[in-house]
UniProtKB/Swiss-Prot annotation:
The lineage of its organism: Bacteria, Pseudomonadati, Pseudomonadota, Gammaproteobacteria, Enterobacterales. InterPro entries: AlgH-like. Belongs to the UPF0301 (AlgH) family. Disulfide bonds: none annotated. This is UPF0301 protein ETA_28320.
C-alpha cells in the first residue's frame, strides 16, 4: 500500500492536540516510512506575505491581483523552522519533488521568489514543519483506526475553505465524519 498523494484524515477518536481533526497530505510513502504536511491547521498571525518579509524577499514584478495574505500552515511537529511549499506542477524549482502529476513539493528559496508574481504556480500552500512516520509506523496507526485515507484532491488541498477540509476529505470517500462512532460495539 502506497499512500503518496493521499490524505490522512484523523478519526474523531484521535485526541492528540496536534493531529485532532487534521488532514495530512502524504508527500512520500515508501518502505522506509512516510512524510506529509498537515494542510488544515493555519498558524496564528502568520501569512505568506509575512514569511516573505521575514526572509527579505520582495518580488520585483509584483502582480497586485495575486493575494499574499494567505495563511501559512503548521505542517507538523518536525523541523518547524523549515518551509515546505506544495504547489501545482506547471513549474519546478531547484529543490522540487513531484508528488503526483499535478502536485509538487519544493523546499528551495526560488519558489518563494515567484510568489506574488506572474511566475508563481497557480496553486500554492506554504507550511512550516512536517510530519514523519518511521518504517511500519503509519501502517500500525492505520490498523489502530487512527486515520481514514482518501486519494488526494487538489480542490480540497488548495481551494476548500480551511475549516471544511477535514469534513470534505472524509466526504470525498463517502464518509460523514460526524457520524462515526467512537467505539466499536458488540452484537
Amino acid at each position: 500500500m502506497n499512500l503518496q498523494h493521499h490524505f490522512l484524515i484523523a478519526m474523531p477518536t484521535l485526541q492528540d492536540p496536534l493531529f485532532k481533526r487534521s488532514v495530512v497530505y502524504i508527500c512520500e510513502h515508501n518502505a522506509d516510512g512516510a512524510m506529509g504536511l498537515i494542510v488544515n491547521k493555519p498558524m496564528e498571525n502568520l501569512t505568506v506575505e509575512g514569511i516573505l518579509k521575514k526572509l527579505k524577499i520582495a518580488p520585483t514584478a509584483r502582480e497586485p491581483d495575486i493575494r499574499l495574505d494567505k495563511p501559512v500552515f503548521s505542517g507538523g511537529p518536525l523541523a518547524e523552522d523549515r518551509g515546505f511549499i506544495l504547489h501545482s506542477a506547471q513549474k519546478t524549482f531547484t529543490s522540487s519533488i513531484r508528488v503526483s502529476d499535478n502536485t509538487v513539493i519544493t523546499t528551495s528559496r526560488d519558489v518563494l521568489e515567484t510568489l506574488g508574481t506572474a511566475e508563481q504556480p497557480d496553486n500554492v500552500l506554504v507550511a512550516l514543519g512536517y510530519c514523519a512516520w518511521e518504517k511500519d509506523q503509519l501502517e500500525q496507526e492505520l490498523l489502530e483506526n487512527a486515520w481514514l485515507t482518501s486519494p488526494a484532491n487538489s480542490n480540497i488541498l488548495f481551494h476548500t475553505p480551511i475549516a471544511e477540509r477535514w469534513r470534505e476529505a472524509a466526504k470525498s470517500i463517502g464518509v460523514d465524519i460526524h457520524n462515526i462512532a467512537s467505539e466499536a460495539g458488540h452484537a
